């Protein structure tokens, strides 16, 4: 059995040849390659988002499209034939226009870009392979995983599932600053490999909210129901703004110090489904290109922390990624034989938004101050369900996406098809994806 484990946004402290790799990739990867990857990542993000929302329409949603894409792209290094085609096309790549090697070089470029030092935003991202100690992994796969995806390799004794589980979870916890503590559970003795991709993000608002201004206020779940939340407030803020009359929503961008920003999309009352149905890469480009600096007299945003847990092996087949979960899976580029298939893809994410900024992690297994004229008076209150997209402004990649339907919600749902468990956390954003591989 082989497994791919959840990815957490974060970067290993040691990566061989990183500076050399950055120079080589910058020389060999064109801007077209990276733009293609960014567009495909956005397309995949919105497609997955619609599936998650369809299964749980009234729940909070938070996930890292980049983490999930990276885990699956890394897995595709070991895939052949139709299994390979399904994975890459499921990630929204046009294989006629973008050859497979260009896709992997694009990920290499973005991962190197995200891990460059000196940024005021803390972004850590990386991958790890946990391999059954008796399993022979092809040297070519291991080297490509290291060179293209910065993947570290470790041996594990899956004949002792509890010990192997602790090894993997400790690794993820350490690389997500303790935000993702239990990425995987229930490993079986038949597990042969677990692939983990992680990402960790921590950013400070360029214009932080004053905690002394935070107050209790109503958040309207719908036209009839509301809850009391901690509402942050700021005033006389000059920030990118766009009013989309066509989709009946307001778009505001709040910047972090460094190369990151958060885009907030606030649909008019009753217009959330209309906005969700229109989510396409072209829509995001339109919003970004239409944002203009605007003085906002008062902006209110709830302080919140949400956590989700998804079993993606039930959702990815709906996006065309099917064969890798079946006995027809061809992952022979990993071991040289067709003896592996993916049994589980778990994605865990934690998102916290507070006065000073945002902290996030994920794992996949598999204010300008000024004066405002009376006629320019503008108030924006995020006191009803809204969307949030966190992006790296240098790589132009969407790192996290969230839908906040209830900032105060704390629920547990049974793990199942499309199920998620949500709990309140504080000051963090983490993502993790594990892919579990088993023998056939």
Curated annotation (Swiss-Prot):
Molecular function GO terms recorded: cysteine-type endopeptidase inhibitor activity; serine-type endopeptidase inhibitor activity
InterPro entries reported for this sequence: Serpin_CS (IPR023795), Serpin_dom (IPR023796), Serpin_fam (IPR000215), Serpin_sf (IPR036186), Serpin_sf_1 (IPR042178), Serpin_sf_2 (IPR042185)
Q: Where in the cell is it found?
A: Cytoplasm; Nucleus
PROSITE patterns assigned: SERPIN
Tissue expression as described in the entry: Expressed in bone marrow (particularly hematopoietic stem cells), heart, kidney, liver, lung, skeletal muscle, spleen, testis, thymus and T-cells.
Keywords attached to this Swiss-Prot or TrEMBL record, sorted alphabetically, are: Adaptive immunity, Apoptosis, Cytoplasm, Immunity, Nucleus, Protease inhibitor, Serine protease inhibitor, Thiol protease inhibitor
Pfam families tied to this protein: Serpin
Site positions for Reactive bond, renumbered to this chain?
371-372
Q: Which SUPFAM superfamilies match?
A: Serpins
Give the function comment from the record.
Answer: Serine and cysteine protease inhibitor. Can inhibit lysosomal papain-like proteases including the cathepsins B, G, H, K, L and V. Ineffective against elastase, granzyme A, granzyme B, or caspases 3, 8 or 9. Inhibition of cytoplasmic cathepsin B following release from the lysosome may protect cells from apoptosis. This may facilitate the survival of progenitor T-cells and the subsequent development of long term memory CD8 T-cells.
Protein name (database record): Serine protease inhibitor A3G
Per the UniProt entry, what species is this protein from, by scientific name?
A: Mus musculus
Gene, per the UniProt record: Serpina3g
